[in-house]
Amino acid sequence: MSTAALITLVRSGGNQVRRRVLLSSRLLQDDRRVTPTCHSSTSEPRCSRFDPDGSGSPATWDNFGIWDNRIDEPILLPPSIKYGKPIPKISLENVGCASQIGKRKENEDRFDFAQLTDEVLYFAVYDGHGGPAAADFCHTHMEKCIMDLLPKEKNLETLLTLAFLEIDKAFSSHARLSADATLLTSGTTATVALLRDGIELVVASVGDSRAILCRKGKPMKLTIDHTPERKDEKERIKKCGGFVAWNSLGQPHVNGRLAMTRSIGDLDLKTSGVIAEPETKRIKLHHADDSFLVLTTDGINFMVNSQEICDFVNQCHDPNEAAHAVTEQAIQYGTEDNSTAVVVPFGAWGKYKNSEINFSFSRSFASSGRWA
């Protein structure tokens, strides 16, 4: 699409576009802001639907050949001109989040999202173990660490790698100076996503919390779990003098203690090959095809597969409802762990709502105890 056409579409457009902008501004004035705070699953879901023609059906921009979207967002004009296609502004008000304690005594999961600059958004989940100290440390300091690095490093993959290593080093200093000896065995996963100009998505992770992009209704995995089951990870552990032992459930653990091979914290295992260097992935969003990004902790991942997550989210009216649906489904399937989800809507939100839900009703009923 030409620059002139983009500017015409955004600044003037037809009556339908102007009416949509008016409706959007009214909605944003009335809508309650979603902040990075856990909401109970009984809270009323918010729905961002539009019917400017009075038909009662969701409004779309199909007449302009752009995308089918049930969440109305303004266009980012400079990036749209730069990339030659409309790029919607992702508003934090529309990000959904939910966290459930499960059957644990304490919720050690943490999540966060923020606008770091005019161009960069930040989303993260942290799944603590050995207490919440490491997850709390990341929740408190990671955002500022990334902000401090942004003016110095333009490559977001390099930036996130530096941020993870700096946070791990800072937590190590904090733990060693603390009188609390339990901090030496406290650690956390970290899955962090940065979105620049509404189109460049970069994800970095250590541990087994995941990031999934829903493209054309199908999951695109942006992270790979760091476990001793991976040959490359296991080899590093052994080269560093560590070992892998299996518990009574047949699950491999580093030195018989930790189920992951990369983390922030876990200072007692640093000499055994447990590292804080993340694996990163960069992807260019296609807003006509990409519905959402979802970040999840292992309380969800080990019970609900990636396609099921996409299907459950696609059936929901808005991201906040979707985040609750995913965490509650994990509980129904029998998870005992904390479960957390952050759902970030993109241009094709709602486009694949009618996709087939591929999950087993017998599994659902059995897990919920209805057939016990």
Curated annotation (Swiss-Prot):
Changing residue 127 to A: Loss of serine/threonine phosphatase activity toward BCKDHA. Mn(2+) 2 binds at residues 127, 298, 337. Gene3D superfamilies: PPM-type phosphatase domain. Signal peptide: none annotated. Mn(2+) 1 binds at residues 127-128. One of its GO terms (cellular component) is mitochondrial matrix. Its cofactor is Mn(2+). It catalyses: O-phospho-L-seryl-[3-methyl-2-oxobutanoate dehydrogenase] + H2O = L-seryl-[3-methyl-2-oxobutanoate dehydrogenase] + phosphate; O-phospho-L-seryl-[protein] + H2O = L-seryl-[protein] + phosphate. Binds 2 Mn(2+) ions per subunit. It is an enzyme of class 3 (hydrolase). Pathway: Protein modification. The keyword Transit peptide applies. Residues 1-29 form a transit peptide. It is found in: Mitochondrion matrix. Its main location: mitochondrion. SUPFAM superfamilies: PP2C-like. One of its GO terms (biological process) is regulation of mitochondrial membrane permeability involved in apoptotic process. This is Protein phosphatase Mn(2+)-dependent 1K. It comes from Homo sapiens.
